[in-house]
Structure formats: structure tokens, C-alpha cells
Amino acid sequence: MQANELFDRPNTILLDGGMGTMLQAAGLKLGARPEELNITDPALIESIHARYAAAGSRIINANTFGASAHKLADSEYTLEKIIAAGIANCKRACAPYGALAALDVGPLGELLEPNGTLAFEDAVAEYGRIVRAGVAAGADLVFLETFTDLYELKAALLAVKENSSLPVLASMSFEAGGRTFTGCTVESFAATARGLGADAVGINCSLGPKEIFPMAKRLTEALPGSFPVFVKPNAGLPRADGSGYDITPQLYAMQMKPYRELGLFAAGGCCGTTPEFIQLLNGVFADCRPGRPDHPMKSVVCSPMDCVDVDGITVVGERINPTGKKRFQQALREGDMNYVLEQAVSQTEAGAQILDVNVGAPGVDEPALMEQVVKALQSVVSLPLQLDSSHAEALERGLRVYNGKPIVNSVNGEAEKLNTILPLCKKYGAAVVGLAIDERGILPKAEDRVAIARRIRDAALAAGIPQEDIYIDCLTLTASAQQEDVLATVQALHACKEELGVRTILGVSNISFGLPCRSYLNTTFLTMAMYAGLDLAIMNPSSEEMMAAVYAYNVLTNRDRQSTKYIERYANRVPASAALVQAMQNAQTAPAAGETPEAAGPYAPLMKAVEKGLKGEAAARTRALLEEKEPLELVDEALIPALDIVGAKYEKGTLFLPQLLQAATAAQGAFEEIKTAIAQKGEGSASKGRIVIATVKGDVHDIGKNIVRVILENYGFEVIDLGRDVPVETVVNTVREKDVHLVGLSALMTTTLKSMEETIRALHDAKLDCKIMVGGAVLTPEYAKKIGADWYAKDAKQSADIAKEFFGV
């Protein structure tokens, strides 16, 4: 099979299974790097590939999953040499069977900013080096797998596209709740990966076939019927005794049968699967054809955690725009991100579903500022963004660092703009707004605007932008200056919807500029536009009249099924007159000085800043409170309760890892102010307890452990982080020398569970007065108990809960 035939096969292709599983069975030594075996034991690696090929695999992943500069930093072999050897071994094994050799690429093992310290462009560069090495070695395709961070997957996809012309398959790993470790949804993955040019997308690792199936079904529903989809589930879950996985090859094949209905392009296995598993898949997929019946594609934009389906009127918050706002312009010139973030948070709370982002102001570097603002916004809010600029460089800077699928606002009918901006939208997978204007300006007649819109639509389709990603703005003119043209906008909008089959968008509030009681005009015009077919309304979400019109319209047009969203928003609302009476009563019964109920206490603004991840705001609020309150009082009465609130929401699944980490970052900003205040008073900083944490010997994965450290430190604990691949004796000696009474151990791989057990045994044998908590993807509560741990912590928040319980704080 040739790479150019990959997506024209009449039947579902079989992928391979677990390389790590096979190496472990072959006696891989603890701490050994599997990728170095490409050079030190090529016969072993080639034989494993050959067994998979003989079992029916026609895409074989080279033994390069962990081959990155980050993970091979202290290897005696270069990245290029390891990849070259890995591809060569794979191609030799593939040749007799006509199989393809894939450059297997996994995560770098380090969190990207803002959740970690790895810069996005550094990640792109590191992946670019990997891809170039694979191309030079003769890889037939690139297989990106086991990603949990959509931002890192974007970096990898850009690197593949910018450094090769090879086909690329992209896969993420999802947890049982339907999101990745960092909170990414299946739908956000589908929209983003497809937009960035992945040739096929899939789900691998984490769970078994039965658990992955509902997510795989959602993946197919989020993509065109012809778009290739694949799966590589685990052989179930790890056994509690660490002896392998709990699904046999026969049961695996049985649980894979429902996938026949999904029209998979390819199927294989991941952790715990062997050639015997793949052999049985031949019978499951022998007569299966890839692809599914076509279905109408939804118009979506997304961040990792929030995929917005533009079904019904969707509200785009307009407030991140400096036009006519002196305070906003000043904030942009001064680089005051706190002001921008406050606008984003307030619009989110008011009900915006997408945020328009415009940073064009006199005296600013718009491209640099667009990049800075996009990074800042996506570190705090989860809403998708609409990048609002006519400046191509500013758009590209924002598009490149955006995590998800955004909207570009905008392009117009001028040939130069079309030729410049549409390719950017295509490269970065963005939806696009087309303004019904060209070199002649805004034309008064509706039919002329529709003609421009048709030209924009046709150009976008020719550039490879799907129909569902094209939005037309027929341009709102002010009623005060061009009253006679107001209806033309509505008529043009309706015609675009009916004749061109595109989505529509309007900046609604422009209609009332220069007139009194603007909300009356805005709401009425919004209602007219909605009836004409408006999809996206750029407006102020703090306008209760306009928001009420949106929610009511979606009910009355049967878009809000069972009035669910309307009831959720308005069930507990009271009429304005009743609200006024209640406010007067509240004023008469205001809490006395010293009383601090949650809604009225002096700590509420600080707690909110922490909860929302606003580091600058949290620091400013802390400085103000320190003028009246004792430093440690702020810790106990505001910061810890705020972190507890965030932690509770994290456990309930109403917020996710990025928000948890940003809340911790905001709390850290407050803690720095508190430490300064304590130092100025000549007092020592009081630790709530000392904890040693480490990733055990042989395991080089430390993302989870690093997250635990951040959370523990923000709860006021002193953390001694020993790093990764930590020898048993180092843990024991540190606990003894530092007089530590709580230890946290982490392991991600089944091969290092024995090392964790040995570390726990050594701590017990040394008769040290300490308790031990353990965590990691391969651990279970039962196995933790079996190896002598005192607690199993499923995540960073639970680690903090254990520490609080242990130290009695």
C-alpha cells in the first residue's frame, strides 16, 4: 500500500497495538528508554513490528512515541539518530506485508503555557525537529497520539504541516467523563483538528472499547460522513495487582463489534493489546467500509472546553473593543491586561457565548497586542473568541496562538483582502466573517450587498473553507444618519440566508449610535434581524432587554427545546419593581460591621478574583485588604475558602484543569503580597506542613506531579519536589533528613508500579514516621492499598484534601 492510497481503501484498515506492552513482556528494564532500543536492540523492535504486520496491521507505528528532545535530554543518542533507526526498523518489518511505517509522535511531557512553562512556539519548534527527522528517515505518514492538551496537539499539527507533506493522523485520549485530562471536549477536538488539516482523527488509550464507544460516536457525529475516523482503545483497565489489563483478546474483539456501525477508517489497539488482539479484529472489520452517510454539518466555534453550536441566536460580546472608549485605549497602550480580562469575565457572567476581540487603537502595536490579549483571555475565560481586525498580521498572530477554532472578523469583497485573509483562515481552521462591502463602500441596495456576499462566499469555498464556516455581515448603519438604509440591511440579511445558505452576523448596537434611549432601538432592531435570519448578534450582553429578546426568540422559534435555557436563566428572576423593593429591604438590614457573609463580606472581591483566575486583580485586592487585615487572616478567611470553592467545582466537573491552575496562579499572586507583608513585619512565613513529592524511579512523566505541587503550595504547604525518575534512596534520605511526615509518589506507567512499591517498602523498612499518598493514571485505590500506601489521590485537588486532613488544617 502506498501513502497516497491510504484514504481510498475499500475496507477498514487495521492499526497496530501496544508497543510498550510488548516491550514489557520482553523484559524491558526499569528506567530504560524504549526508543533507545531502536539502536541497541533493533532485532527486538523489528520483530514486534513484524508480528503486528503478520496479524493484519497495515499502518505500523515506529518506536518513536517518546522521541523528543525534552525526553531524550540526557540520552547518548541524538533525536535524529533514534528516529532514523526507529523508522528503518519499522520499514523493514512493513515491507513484506505492504504496510505503511508511521512516525509515532506523542506529547512532549511538559505543560504548555499558561498551564505550564513551555512556550507554544517552543513546542512547535520541538515538534518540527521531530517531523523533519521522520521525513528524512522515510516515514510514510505521521501519527499523533495520546494527546490530552488541545493546544499541544495544535502545535504538533502545525509542525507537521509546516515541515512536511505527509498525511497526518491525530488522536486524543479522553477520560470516562468525555473530556481529556485538561478538559477538552470531543467536539472541540473534532472541530480544531479538522480545521488545522488533520487527515484523520481518532481516540486512543485511557479506556477500553466499551467506554470509548460513546465518545467515538460523538466524534463521527461532529465530522462530515466522509471524514476518516479511527480508534485504538486499551485492553480495558489495569489490574489492581499490576499484572496487566483486564480484557482478553476475545472480549476485546467482541466489544469492538459495535464500532462497525461507525464506518471507521481504521481500528487497532493501545495499552495492553498485542498481536493476538489485532488478529481477531480481522474478523470484526473484514467487510466494513469506511465512511458514513452525509449529514448537515453544524456551524461551531470552540475553545478546548466550550464548543458553541450556532443553532439559534448566539450572542457575541462586543465590549473588548477600544473604539470610542478612552479608558480602554489607555489600558491597551499601557499593556493593562487586567482591564481587558475584567471585560471578558463580566461579559461571560452576563451570558455572552463568544467574545469579540478588537485591539486596534492609536499608538499600539496591534499584531503584538492581539497575540498578547488572546493569550491572556484564553488563560482566564473558556468562551471561544472572534478575532476582530482588518490587519492581516494581527489576525495571524492571534490565530496562531489561539487554542481551538475561532472566528475571523473580517474579510470584505476587495480582491486583496480575500487573497490575504482567506488563506489564513484556511491554515488555522477558522470560520470567517465576510463584510458585504468592497472598493465602492457600503452600497445602499440590498441586492448589491448580496452580490458582494456571494462573491465572498464563492472565494471562501474556493479557498477550502467549508460552507458552515462562512458568516456574512450585511452591515448595520446608524438610524440617526442613514435611516432610509436600515431596512436594506435586514432585507440583505434575509436574502443571504435564503439564497446563499450561509450564516449571518451583525453588529447590532451600531443602529442606535447618536440617539437617546439606545436600548429601545437596539432591542427592536435585534428582533427584526432575528426574524430575518440572524445567527450571530454582536451586542452588549449586559443589556437585559436585548438578552431577554434573544432568549425569548429562541423559545418562540422552537430552537430552545422545552424552553430549557430560558427557564434556567429566568426561573428565579423577579420583576424590576419587586427587585427594587427587595433592594430597599436589603439596605435596611445590611450586615453590621465585622459580619462577613459570603455575598457582603470584605473578602468577596478577592475570592472572586481567585475563582476567576485574575492574578493582577487578586494581588490588588490583597494589597488593599492588608491595610486593615492581618496577612494570615486573609489566607484562612479568603484564599483557602476560594480555592476550596474552585476545587469543589473541579470535582463536580463544572470547571476543569486550566481553570483550577489559573485559580492557583491568581492565589499565588495574592500569596506573594502576603509574604511581602509578613517579611515587612519581621515575621516568619507560617507553613501548614512539609510534604515531599516525587515521580518514582524509572518514570520520566511529571506533569501530574507538577500540578499537585502547584495546588499544594497554594494551600500553604511547603513542598519539597524531588523531580522525576527519583531513586528510592533519595526519597528515603530526604524524608529522614528534612523530618517530613507526608510523602506523595507519582507513577504514570505500569512498568514503574513496582518501583513505587519498592519506594513505599523502603520508607516502611526505614521506620520513618510518615504517611504516603500515591497517584497516577495507572493506579487504582485497590492497588494503592495493596502496595502499602495510606491514600490514593485521583487528582491534585484530592491530594490537597488529604494534606489538609493529615495536618489538621
Features from the language model and the residues they span:
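Domain-level signal for soluble alpha/beta catalytic cores
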Residues: M1-D473, L477-V809
